[in-house]
Amino acid sequence: MPTISVKKREIEKLLGKSYDSETFSDILFNYGLEIDECIEESDDITYKIEIPANRYDLLCAEGLNYALQSYLFGKVFEDINLQSSEYTIFKQHFGNRSCVAAAIIKNYKFDKYSYDSFISYQEKLCGNLGRNRSLVSMGTHDLDTISWPVTYKSIKKTELKFAPLNCTKEINDLEMHFKDDKNIGKYLQYVDNDNYIVFMDAKGHILSVPPVINSNRTKISVNTTNILVEVTGTNTYKVNTCLKMILSAFRTDNMCQVNIISDKQEILEIKDKSYLLSIDEVYKELNINISVIDLSDLLIKMMYKTNIIDDKHLNVTVPSVRQDVLHKADLIEDIAICYGFNNINMVMPDINTIGSENRLNKFSDKLRLEMCMLGFTEVYTMVLVSKSDNIFGDNSAVVSNYKSLECEAVRSSLYPGLMKAVSSNLHCKIPIKIFEVGDVVFLDSESDVGARNRRYLSCLYVGNKSHLEDVQGPMTVILEKCGIKDYKFERMDDEKKYLKNQSA
């Protein structure tokens, strides 16, 4: 889960109330969060707080403050209100990353802590919601340095000329300048081969090159009070969500929308979802007797707005920043959090079941026992493998957001793992006799998740004079133990995977 660092003094300043570390930890725990680490410094305490992956609104101290203001003090959470304006961005790019949204925050007063929090929140949104800028990227600019209107367009790489963030010298080749930069270089993969996508103001100054870097000319600082926030990406919903999040956390009384004009005018849509909820539904799931008024109070403490219809029903409005709410079940979960899980009566379920071991796991354990009695040692290898190692992977499931080349695909055979185990233990005495019982994954269009699991047994023998009978014998024993009598061994002509005339 993502974590945020919050200074004790700053969060207490935002909340308007002081808590000792133990009390604050209990408050967060009851809310569904957890302090991962408490770092004591000479003049302050820093809390490292684990945030659920779907609560993007809590990834900064300001967003956490708004949530706790409602939870602790029952303060009604107000959604953001954007005023209309004459600020305009002309969209002339309609290819990759054509989704654009923008807004302006006016009269925001930064201090060092809130400025650092603003920059950190921007990066966390791009990293989590934006999948490391592959789906969404965000740029923030000093409004007072921009000449309007602004154009979002594609230019040839030879036309690029600007000073990147924290650089005073102008450059005309991003790839050459940032190819060895560990922080910026990883985003160059999202740039087109022949063109750069840029925001350019009326005087021809480049504001940013999404999703790589902003211009140093429009860099914001602690003294910046008026901020342009622009968000681009491949998905309109995620682009709008990302913009709503940062506007909500760093709100002022003077925020305005930026008109995106292409073939039609596009305005940032902030639509609130609503649900009709009854106390009977809450009782069914949580087994608590509660009045509709008390239910309304609980929901308000979890940032919702309510409208009581009658003594059993109320309408619940979900604020736009609560993108984690997808179903009534999420509302009921929040009710349980606010009510307190320890306050819910525990009852025995109406249906009693007798637990038993899964039949497949039971059979797998018996196979393991037989293989061990045959002199083989069990190994456990990685389920994720590289594409090059997954030689049986013609129909394998590939990981879309892998962290390393060793974790590109889900294994479709146990064989590569066994070979790696041997290669890592060549110092051991021979013969080496190892086996593994484990799941492999294949793509399957008929499955509801697009793939299916299969449980495989694989064994490997290494010796000075290895022969086919060294593994054929154990396999014969296993087949007979399983009651399989009608089987035969055939030659297997696959020179990619086995030596010629050495497989069956």
Curated annotation (Swiss-Prot):
One of its GO terms (cellular component) is phenylalanine-tRNA ligase complex. Its cofactor is Mg(2+). Its EC number is 6.1.1.20. One of its GO terms (molecular function) is magnesium ion binding. One of its GO terms (biological process) is phenylalanyl-tRNA aminoacylation. The keyword Disulfide bond does not apply. This is Probable phenylalanine--tRNA ligase beta subunit. It comes from Vairimorpha ceranae (strain BRL01). The lineage of its organism: Eukaryota, Fungi, Fungi incertae sedis, Microsporidia, Nosematidae.
